[in-house]
From Swiss-Prot:
One of its GO terms (biological process) is CUT catabolic process. The lineage of its organism: Archaea, Methanobacteriati, Methanobacteriota, Stenosarchaea group, Methanomicrobia. PANTHER family: EXOSOME COMPLEX COMPONENT RRP4, PNAS-3 RELATED. Keywords: Cytoplasm, Exosome, RNA-binding. Component of the archaeal exosome complex. Forms a trimer of Rrp4 and/or Csl4 subunits. The trimer associates with a hexameric ring-like arrangement composed of 3 Rrp41-Rrp42 heterodimers. Belongs to the RRP4 family. Non-catalytic component of the exosome, which is a complex involved in RNA degradation. Increases the RNA binding and the efficiency of RNA degradation. Confers strong poly(A) specificity to the exosome. The keyword Thylakoid does not apply. This is Exosome complex component Rrp4. NCBIfam families: PRK04163.1-1. InterPro entries: Exosome_RNA_bind1/RRP40/RRP4 (IPR026699), KH_dom (IPR004087), KH_dom_type_1 (IPR004088), KH_dom_type_1_sf (IPR036612), NA-bd_OB-fold (IPR012340), Rrp4 (IPR023474), RRP4_N (IPR054371), RRP4_S1 (IPR048565). It is found in: Cytoplasm.
Length: 260
């Protein structure tokens, strides 16, 4: 069964104590203030937006991409309407201005924490934590930031399953950028799963649906693999089973030829 989609003004609950994100209270009743998915929990009711830009908040952990290097700051694209600023003092060690492009240069991807967002939407970033670092391998997939909770799942159920079933390393930024790393075929499989999660975020039982999807895709991957090859006597050349058999028969014919 699909989850209920609501629009602004829809009645969600008559219990004022349960008002959550994406709601407003009027006459002791809770209404939706967004177009999104009704999110009912024991202690509150809220709305998960169907779409919308990422709006940074303090303590968010995001994946940023360096777009400018100045003598004292790195400026990052954080997949938001506003760029993020990492001051050199927020780097884990002392850095001279001339070193900055060598440490983080334009195009580099980094896991960062949002330190502060002021009233003018100036976004300050931080890197002073062992879990925050430059990403040197893997690739980045972008999903809508409002779909991030579905990628993670209740209690981390979805992301734990994705890691186990694809054998990939995964980090989900709150800005919708997801870093993945692993073997090529595993990355391809995980990328498909993430796209499916994004498209079907409003569906119930999504973790089970994605689990079954991954199992079926694994079967297809195995069935599509080519038949094994035998190595030929010539270095760097491979031969099929049929070629290998023909070579053996040719050698036997030579041995049995009365002229030899």
């Amino acid at each position: 069964m699909d989850k209920k989609i609501v629009i602004p003004g829809d009645l969600l609950s008559e219990n004022q104590k349960k008002a959550g994100y994406g709601t407003y209270v009027k006459n002791d009743k809770i209404y939706s203030s967004l177009c999104g998915i009704e999110n009912l929990k024991e202690d509150k009711v809220g709305v998960i937006p169907l779409a919308g830009a990422y709006i940074p908040s303090a303590n968010d952990v995001v994946i940023g991409i360096v777009i400018v290097v100045t003598p004292s700051n790195w400026i990052f694209d954080i997949a938001a309407p506003y760029d993020g600023l990492l001051h050199v003092s927020e780097y884990p060690r002392r850095v001279e201005s001339r070193e900055m492009p060598e440490i983080l240069n334009v195009g580099d991807s980094v896991i960062l924490r949002v330190k502060d967002v002021d009233s003018s939407m100036k976004v300050e970033l931080a890197l002073r934590d062992p879990s925050l670092h430059k990403l040197k391998t893997g690739q980045i997939i972008k999903v809508e930031s409002v779909k991030v909770p579905r990628v993670i799942g209740h209690g981390g159920s979805m992301i734990s399953m994705l890691k186990k079933e694809t054998n990939c390393s995964i980090f989900v930024g709150q800005n919708g950028r997801i870093w993945i790393d692993g073997k090529d075929e595993d990355i391809e499989l995980l990328s498909k799963a993430l796209r499916k999660i994004e498209l079907e975020a409003q569906r119930s039982g999504l973790t089970d649906r994605i689990y079954n999807f991954l199992k079926n895709e694994r079967i297809r991957q195995k069935e599509s693999k080519p038949v094994g090859f035998f190595k030929n006597e010539t270095e760097g050349v491979t031969a099929t089973k049929e070629d290998h058999s023909e070579e053996i028969y040719r050698k036997i014919d030579v041995l049995l030829d009365p002229k030899n």
